[in-house]
């Protein structure tokens, strides 16, 4: 299972993967870890990344960038209208009121949604990751700006689905950076100690995001977020471009803003100038050739002048920095450090502004470009069951307050705040309503100053609601949740039904709750009809705590189910016992039958039970429907297939072109003597005709046509190339042949001279070796002589491969014979020294003679001796030998 994190930025994207015990940022086919977030469409194909960015000026109308700012946005949105004026492509309104992007593709006008374009970049990143990992990539984590709304986050998830990815988590940029920072820190305070407060500032291409996070060992908690979604590096580029546009108008009488291509070139040069000023305080020059009307322009600016121009922008930088301090009630001295990331954070004046607010130097311990992607990969590893990661809890927050609204049954509408700004996320809440019929909840952002015109999140209809048997309102429990993606949902709804009870139970059981609606519930019914929810159970804390608390809520409801079931079981057992008692009494006495039945009836009682009905929920949001997502997924698959075919066709065409140029050069150089004059002339003419065909009739042919063309050329060129290669390899092969003959010839000489080393080899076997060697020598000499008669441009008599094959066949015959091991000398059998003492004693014969050392044979059997043993080395003829001889050590 792959563990991949994608950071899709407004200008560029990065891929990080967890493997080898760490996090690695991946490079693309250009050996660059940065992939431009650009998609370009042409008459024949589409391109993404670096190839698309190269067409940003020449094909600007069909090259889409900065699409991230249009996801799930209305065309009428003021910020959309503002961005539409600065992008070079055409923005249109879709039938649903959202933004569409119009381009010319394959000769037709096509309109794509921002989600589709986002998916195209994800497709490119996915392909790069799969090439690096050599496996399929499905699960991933994707970063989004912290200010993204519910619909925008849903749009990113849909884009991942269109690209064939399973997005495990949508994580805020600054939260991902904080995770990448904190998980490797070994010096964080313990959970019991005061947390370490760190500020993260992400200044990217189009936005500024600030976050304050509290760190303890194994725990990260986001305290506050603030951002300016319209302040980034591109705003400084526009500032410089406006400055030079006025300068060129004054000095050259040239309006570069009237020409889109000239303006794009100026913007690109201003970006380079801005980066140079970040590293140099000297005067920076800018030169653009043929910017417009075949005229060159130049300009100069210093860092001081640039900072003076950007004074208003730098003031805006202070706003979110001060905002997070106000939200958290922290002082600058409470901040441990300030970590800056993002390409635009390299601007010196931005660093100075941050330093002025927090009264601390900025820290750059994180990789400013790759930190977000690395945090995403870490989050994916935490969520993946195949990776073991150090325990680290992440508690994020909701960027905007959320409220619920509903229509009252008696004309008065109701509302309540579900979560406040900076509420911990994910979280769940259980709400209680009293209704007789299905009803609808409307979720919206509560802040009227929200930077988006449409504050509604969605509508959620609770279906299947019915009144009680008494005609009163039923108790409805609704669970709302903001999940790990930061997306709001009505997770579940259930109706609590109280089943009716018998009159006897009402008399025996005095509990008002069991006998019917209590006073509180009775008043609650009317109160509910006036739209006051009767119960809400807020859940705070991290992901684990929120889930646990939500489960407790649900378990409380399920507990009532189990209690009811237990009481039913008890009632059933009681009834069964009474019945058995009744049967026994009826067997004993018929007269007691009526009395027993009366007792059983009195004992039989049914406690009031509670039954829970799960209710269906119909959610209506402005996100893409399932059908639309499936259609876009199929269309993306067709685009990928078309791109693959186009690439294969271009590769085949390039192969033909490359072969033509290569062979034309070699025919006059390396291959000159390996082809006849006549053949060289005809082949050169064919190569020239093929080149002309490529740029005329063959400019746009199918892959098979190009393959046929190159195969026809190789029929002529390959023999020439083979003759060249054989001429290089053949002398070495003959030399190896001669070296292989030497040991066999030497062995034959030694054998003929009677060398002891080979005396064990039979004459017939050595004759085989001699015959084989003579045949191979004759074959070599004949081939060498025949090859010497051939001209270089003629096909060779023998190839290097054939020579090596002959060497192997010779070794196959000769090696087993000459390497035959000499047999070992035969071992002599042991001499017979007569019977052992034990055998001699059995047979009653004389004892055997002594050994060479003068010692007699010993026997260590357990039989008791019958006499003294003779001394070692002495033999007395007249002395009788004992039955057993023993020698003690």
From Swiss-Prot:
<keyword id="KW-0547">Nucleotide-binding</keyword>
<dbReference type="InterPro" id="IPR013126">
    <property type="entry name" value="Hsp_70_fam"/>
</dbReference>
<dbReference type="GO" id="GO:0005524">
    <property type="term" value="F:ATP binding"/>
</dbReference>
<comment type="function">
    <text>Cell surface recognition protein that binds acrosome-reacted sperm and thereby mediates binding and subsequent fusion of the sperm and egg.</text>
</comment>
<feature type="compositionally biased region" description="Basic and acidic residues">
    <location>
        <begin position="869"/>
        <end position="889"/>
    </location>
</feature>
<dbReference type="GO" id="GO:0000774">
    <property type="term" value="F:adenyl-nucleotide exchange factor activity"/>
</dbReference>
<dbReference type="InterPro" id="IPR029048">
    <property type="entry name" value="HSP70_C_sf"/>
</dbReference>
<dbReference type="GO" id="GO:0005829">
    <property type="term" value="C:cytosol"/>
</dbReference>
<keyword id="KW-0067">ATP-binding</keyword>
<dbReference type="Pfam" id="PF00012">
    <property type="entry name" value="HSP70"/>
</dbReference>
<dbReference type="GO" id="GO:0006457">
    <property type="term" value="P:protein folding"/>
</dbReference>
<dbReference type="InterPro" id="IPR018181">
    <property type="entry name" value="Heat_shock_70_CS"/>
</dbReference>
<feature type="region of interest" description="Disordered">
    <location>
        <begin position="504"/>
        <end position="622"/>
    </location>
</feature>
<dbReference type="InterPro" id="IPR029047">
    <property type="entry name" value="HSP70_peptide-bd_sf"/>
</dbReference>
<dbReference type="GO" id="GO:0005634">
    <property type="term" value="C:nucleus"/>
</dbReference>
<feature type="compositionally biased region" description="Polar residues">
    <location>
        <begin position="586"/>
        <end position="597"/>
    </location>
</feature>
<feature type="region of interest" description="Disordered">
    <location>
        <begin position="812"/>
        <end position="889"/>
    </location>
</feature>
<dbReference type="GO" id="GO:0140662">
    <property type="term" value="F:ATP-dependent protein folding chaperone"/>
</dbReference>
<feature type="compositionally biased region" description="Basic and acidic residues">
    <location>
        <begin position="549"/>
        <end position="585"/>
    </location>
</feature>
<dbReference type="InterPro" id="IPR043129">
    <property type="entry name" value="ATPase_NBD"/>
</dbReference>
<comment type="similarity">
    <text>Belongs to the heat shock protein 70 family.</text>
</comment>
<protein>
    <recommendedName>
        <fullName>97 kDa heat shock protein</fullName>
    </recommendedName>
</protein>
